[in-house]
Amino acid sequence: MNKKVILMILDGWGITQDPKVSAIYNAKTPYINSLYNKYAHASLRTDGEHVGLPEGQMGNSEVGHMNLGAGRIVYQNLARINKAVKEKTLGKEKALLDTFKYAKENNKKVHLLGLVSDGGIHSHINHLKGILDIAKEQEVANVFVHAFSDGRDCDPKSGGKFINDLQDYMKESTGELASVTGRYYAMDRDNRWERIKIAYDGLVNGVGTRTKDVVAAIQQNYDAGLTDEFHKPILITDEENQPKAQIKEGDAVLFFNYRTDRGRELTNALSQNDFPEEEMKKLDLYFTTITLYDESFQNINVIYKNDNIKNTLGEVISRAGKKQIRIAETEKYPHVTFFFSGGQEAPFNGESRILKNSPKVATYDLQPEMSAYELTDALCEDLEKATADFVCLNFANGDMVGHTGIMEAAIKACETVDTCAKTVIETGLKNGYTTLLIADHGNCETMINPDGSPNTAHTTNPVPFVLIDEDLKSLKNGILGDIAPTILDLMGIEQPSEMTQKSLL
């Protein structure tokens, strides 16, 4: 075969057995529905050990795109760090020990920053507990936790429970809670520096709600209609009503989020660059991250450095002398580039990139169409030329709007994707393209929890795989790692030995 291929990733679009909780089922998606009757289709697993995560752990976009591009199961940082905590090898890591040594020798505070939940997408509370235990073993004084509350990869009002759990743990281990800030502010990834500024001011300048009872302050926010994602800085105070710990010049900071995309901006503002328009000034800090957030960052100590994955789909297509396009809006741009390329930032030879800005709204329920129509128009213009041999396209709507927990908006998001998918697929067919319609993980198919509350998290459900091709009529079930071998099979390119998964044709 020598086909041209579009990989269309419907982010957050899973398969559920319970239609009443599904935005997809309740949306009018006549085109995607019609594909199941006309073309070969199967399902893909995107969770747990199928993508290199611990058993039962929901997948996510970073993990999904990495497995899709790699053509193999990529073992993830969550599993790696879980093992290091359990087997106590984390306490032997030089970068961590050096951080504590610096703080002790210079009589400086240690600030532990990160998402405090068991969501397992960006971090895990057990990793923080492991770090606290090592600090206790190393007899480090003045250890402070600045917790970022989740409410997105777990229940929207579970933050109080995690904070109580952490505070109980610190009584036996070491450390004190210094602040709680919602991830909306502390973990932006869309260059909304006005959000990062709010987190920065809480951490550095002591701007926020001051309290001695943090769980009561969280409950007040719940009562006012705010969920964990959106807490503005809550600062725990000392006897003189001053914040227990602000980040000062010369302090040690350890950012324990292992997923890289939502740790970059705050790290940048604290340690790399001044942002005068937001009145944020970088500090001279001993700064450590648990994984490598950005190769361009200077003077960052990294505990676990990832090796780039060799012979990913993009690299193999490039070496075969073929042309490829990566296209997404801002929210998913790193996923179709950096993650899909196995941790490589630079484009391969013959790779072009199309980026459309995500709309500047507070939350995507306010504009569930996002930038899907702009992506569609831009891509179809290229498809008409029929010069690209491979296209990797991401529609972010199902995931990003699914995360809001608002059913009506998620329905609108699904309907938008249906319209855009039709335009792209039909333009592709007209110009000789086979389309693989898949998802990277589930989300918007489960908008309601069993207790009736909104579900904002990913799921462990399988996802669809539809092969839109007039000639090929059968397809096997598989995992995300099987997609790259399937694409190489369609394109008539030899599969490299590093790709250990199989074509599903």
What are these regions (language model features)?
Residues 1-505:
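Feature captures the catalytic ectodomains and active-site-proximal regions of enzymes
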